[in-house]
């Protein structure tokens, strides 16, 4: 059964940069997959990111973000890359409580945890998901 919801982390997952909050806007878009900040720091989308987002939307899969970042900076980067319109419920908050972010997303979108997939490179989330959502 395909997921009803894909929740994406940003740093090191959707894009190459490991901490978008450390960048210095404004951003300038270089091409479809790259932006640069005022300090000449480049941020590149993962090579599969665009296809994943487009495919999910075509199939009616909801998309959300759960990211520990400065919301102004992260959301500006998404806008400059033209990706903000893909997400049904972006949660970008300046704290490490991603479990609360995921719970907020599930509640807001009315999706059960077993119908959601979380994409992140952070292994600390895996153990939390196993305890809290997978039984």
Task: Kindly give the residue locations of the regions a language model identified.
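Active-site neighborhood of HAD-like aspartate-dependent phosphohydrolases
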Residues: 1-54, 58
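Conserved Lys-Pro-Asp/Glu-containing loop-to-beta segment of HAD-superfamily phosphomonoesterases
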Residues: 2-4, 99-124
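Preference for well-ordered, secondary-structure-rich cores of eukaryotic proteins
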Residues: 19, 54-61, 109-117
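Substrate-recognition element of Asp-dependent hydrolases with the DxDx(T/V) motif
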Residues: 44, 49-79, 89-96
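Phosphate- and divalent-cation-binding pockets in alpha/beta enzyme and binding domains
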Residues: 73-76, 101, 127-128
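Conserved H-loop
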Residues: 84-88, 112
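Acidic, divalent-metal-coordinating active-site segment for phosphoryl/phosphodiester hydrolysis
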Residues: 120-135
């Amino acid at each position: 059964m395909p997921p009803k919801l894909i929740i994406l982390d940003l740093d090191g997952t959707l894009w190459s940069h490991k901490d978008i909050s450390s960048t210095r806007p404004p951003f300038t878009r270089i091409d479809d997959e790259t932006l640069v900040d005022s300090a000449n720091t480049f941020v590149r989308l993962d090579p599969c990111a665009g296809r994943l987002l487009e495919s999910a939307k075509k199939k009616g899969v909801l998309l959300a973000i759960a990211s520990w970042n400065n919301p102004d900076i992260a959301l500006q980067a998404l806008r400059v890359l033209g990706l903000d319109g893909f997400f049904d419920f972006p949660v970008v908050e300046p704290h490490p409580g991603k479990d609360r972010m995921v719970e907020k997303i599930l509640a807001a979108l009315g999706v059960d945890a077993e119908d959601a997939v979380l994409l992140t490179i952070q292994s600390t989330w895996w153990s939390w998901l196993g305890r809290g959502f997978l039984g």
